[in-house]
């Protein structure tokens, strides 16, 4: 008699980072082990591809997933898991609601803002570890932010800190995202943010000049957030952050020029260290926190003190 392949023995979670450029899907065990991870270009005209990508990831593992956490690039209603608007993915709003995804996948689904999840991921596993109050700001296709206060993710009914939509040029009504994002950089250089960053680091004069313009706009947005929340640390992420000091130094200079009498607020400005999977790790952390807070949904097969290789409980 042939041995039967092992069936699903533990509950897991499907974590999704839906970006304007990339769609990342991973399946986690309760202990934080990533069993399967897939990355594809976001098919902007095919919102149904999200469900197919999640099903594919599940089919490639032996985990019995019971839940999913999906990070989306825009403000959401945290009460019912409905995206309010996805500026970089117009038309996707109805396809990524918690109610619709739950019905299509037969999973408990939670929707969160992607920058909120990245902030949580950096706070638990990356450059924000060890600090109580932190602002995470990312510049990629768009600009987003997440805020950690007293060690907890901060949001209101309709998300929080939609930094990309702060107006910094009031005469023309232009926002931080209009002027300080990877899209703005691409408009100036003809290259995506990561490529332009590499060229700037290599000394390309056109890329350096474009970065100066974009970095100044981005720094203004970070400056405004720092004076709203007075964090002890600012973590900078996203594709544009690959430029390193070309992006970070303008932020530090602007904060040095105006600190509102608080000499330490926002002075600890660092680059994100969680890598490309930080949004997925934040989604896992959100799910893990939920099952720890609700024993009724805890996986009975996983011990309460299961060690997390990413240091969740550290």
List the model feature ranges, each with a label.
Residues 23-27, 143-148:
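Short beta-strand scaffold segments in enzyme catalytic cores
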Residues 82-93:
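A charged helix-plus-loop insertion that forms the helical arch/lid used to bind
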Residues 114, 140, 283:
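Active-site glycine-centered loops adjacent to acidic/histidine catalytic or metal-binding residues
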């Amino acid at each position: 008699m042939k041995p039967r392949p092992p069936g699903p023995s533990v509950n897991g979670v499907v974590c999704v980072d839906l970006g304007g450029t990339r769609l990342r899907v991973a399946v986690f065990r309760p202990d934080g082990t990533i069993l399967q991870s897939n990355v594809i270009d976001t098919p902007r005209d095919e919102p149904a591809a999200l469900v197919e990508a999640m099903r594919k990831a599940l089919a490639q593992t032996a985990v019995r997933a019971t839940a999913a956490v999906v990070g989306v690039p825009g403000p959401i209603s945290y009460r019912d898991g409905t995206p309010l608007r996805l500026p970089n993915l117009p038309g996707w709003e109805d396809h990524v609601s918690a109610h619709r995804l739950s019905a299509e996948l037969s999973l408990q689904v939670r929707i969160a803002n992607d920058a909120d999840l990245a902030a949580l991921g950096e706070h638990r596993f990356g450059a924000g570890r060890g600090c109580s109050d932190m602002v995470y700001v990312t510049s990629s296709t768009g600009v987003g932010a997440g805020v950690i206060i007293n060690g907890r993710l901060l949001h209101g009914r309709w998300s929080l800190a939609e930094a990309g939509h702060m107006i910094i040029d009031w005469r023309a009504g232009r926002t931080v995202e209009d002027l300080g994002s990877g899209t703005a950089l691409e408009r100036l250089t003809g290259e995506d943010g990561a490529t332009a960053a590499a060229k700037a680091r290599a000394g390309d004069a056109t890329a350096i000049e474009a970065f100066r313009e974009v970095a100044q706009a981005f720094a203004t947005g970070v400056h405004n957030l720092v004076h709203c929340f007075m964090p002890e640390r600012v973590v900078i992420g996203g594709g544009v952050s690959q430029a390193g000091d070309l992006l970070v130094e303008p932020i530090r200079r602007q904060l040095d020029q105006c600190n509102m009498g608080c000499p330490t607020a926002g002075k600890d400005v660092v680059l994100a260290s969680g890598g490309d999977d930080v949004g997925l790790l934040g989604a896992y952390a959100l799910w893990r926190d939920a099952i720890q807070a609700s024993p009724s949904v805890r996986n009975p097969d996983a011990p309460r003190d299961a060690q997390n290789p990413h240091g969740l409980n550290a």
